């Protein structure tokens, strides 16, 4: 059988037909281009599979190329030898070997400096050792010169959830990592508590709990980004690295409210909007308990 590459449902990085990802439009309505922002290579880590009738596959080529609707005759921007592919093998119901792979970069995209706004895709070529090659390109990315008004999102779960077969992987850490045009804002410190009133009218705190909660502000996103963002926030382990370099990585839990603000465009259809949600920092709990 030919070698095939596939990303998982609900992944921000896909090997789908680029024509329906680079331009997120419909047959009627407004047209918008959406490319995932990337500041350096550490902003991208994704999972995918390689299926073949052999147990051997190897990466023959990895390049960053100009964004096009297809992978044919690309203009190579640079080859990146620092990319790392790791994986484990399994067998599907038809006896084919399935390689569960992770792709990530341990170093920055230094070659992209000075290319502010350039759109590009990641192009990979794999060989099964018998001159059966497969070439695939991802959806598009856009280089940004700084991290302002963006946030790196990192998420994983120990079990299979929402289209991600995490149990197939045996890596030490199987993170999905992506950078999105959103940022943390307006921290609040909601408090819950219980009190009782003495006979003389004074009040005594029985229990008080204070948490830190962020509102998230975002730029426009296509519908499939917002769907995948909601799924990412539903994972067991979710971390955000805000654009503020003074802040460190924060583990968060999303509240149950995730809404989308759609643009007011009359009868014109649009499949982009802005997600509205809040994140609770964890662990961040200040407790006063006089009940014990």
Where are each of the predicted segments found?
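Extracellular/virion structural assembly segments
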Residues: 137-292
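Preference for solvent-exposed, low-hydrophobicity sequence contexts
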Residues: 1-153, 160
